[in-house]
Design a protein with these regions (language model features):
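Conserved lysine of the Walker
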Residues: 22
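Nucleotide-state-sensitive switch-loop elements of NTP-binding domains
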Residues: 3-12, 25-26, 35-104, 108, ...
């Protein structure tokens, strides 16, 4: 019997009204999925601010722009999954799109489709210290219940000085999240000056060798600090999958054809 930990993943990255670090988290997770040898399809559904896609315009690891809340494009999204059968589907959802996203999930029967295709849905929410992200997650949890798995990413950018996650930690939403076996992780801070250089040059993390040395080592440090956090949610984030390599026997057999 296949457990939820062994199932392939559709990972929807959420972030309230935006400004949480959602796209940065998409970029770090996509980097580690590809570096880990996971067969991953990546989409940017934030059509008004498609930074996830734009950072990967020149990279060999492309990101497809798709308007998930537009029915024809959502049809194409599910068709592509059925045809290509990746291990992980990563989709950066637009900020403040919760109601439209829930409507589309219901319209397509996404949980049923996912199960039929061998996938489990992960709702991955990037937190700041504002109420809007907590409220957005609460509505998604109430709608999806145990049909999905949950990850909360607490961005350390919002956990400095007088800033903290007290609102989240004392919320009823967190209690519900824990009852649903959600996993909390943190995202380290990427040095602002390095973030700006990467942004201005439009580089993905796969293209870090194009950065000035000082910025490259700060990005490498950010990624080194990110790895154990992401690995703490390995099953929910699909990091356990690796594209199998053909056996030597199969290679010899194919060579003889």
């Amino acid at each position: 019997m296949t457990t939820s930990a062994q199932m392939k993943r559709i990972i929807m990255i959420l972030g309230g009204k935006g400004g949480t670090g959602k796209t940065l988290h998409c970029r770090q997770l996509y980097f580690f999925l590809i570096q880990s040898g996971v067969n991953c399809l990546a989409f940017d559904a934030d059509v008004e601010n498609p930074e996830f896609q734009e950072y990967h315009t020149e990279a060999s690891q492309s990101v497809t722009l798709i308007d998930f809340v537009q029915t024809e494009q959502a049809k194409a999204f599910f068709t592509q999954i059925e045809q290509q059968k990746p291990d992980v589907v990563l989709i950066d959802m637009p900020g403040a799109s919760g109601r439209a996203t829930r409507d589309q999930i219901k319209r397509f029967g996404m949980f049923k489709i996912a199960q039929q295709l061998g996938y489990r849905v992960t709702l991955d929410t990037v937190m700041n210290n504002a109420y809007n992200t907590i409220n957005s997650l609460q509505m998604m949890q109430s709608f999806c219940g145990d049909r999905a798995d949950y990850v909360v990413v607490k961005s350390d950018l919002w956990n400095q000085g007088a800033l903290n996650f007290d609102r989240w930690e004392r919320s009823e939403t967190r209690k519900q999240f824990q009852a649903l076996k959600g996993i909390e992780i943190s995202m380290p801070v990427l040095e602002l000056s390095t973030f700006d250089v990467i942004h201005e040059q439009g580089l993905s993390f796969f293209e870090q060798d194009q950065l000035p040395f000082g910025d490259r080592i700060l990005l490498e440090s950010f990624l080194d600090l990110s790895r154990p956090q992401l690995e703490a949610a390995t099953d929910y984030l699909g990091l356990g999958f690796k594209t199998p390599k053909p056996s030597k026997k199969a290679e010899v057999s194919n060579a003889g054809k």
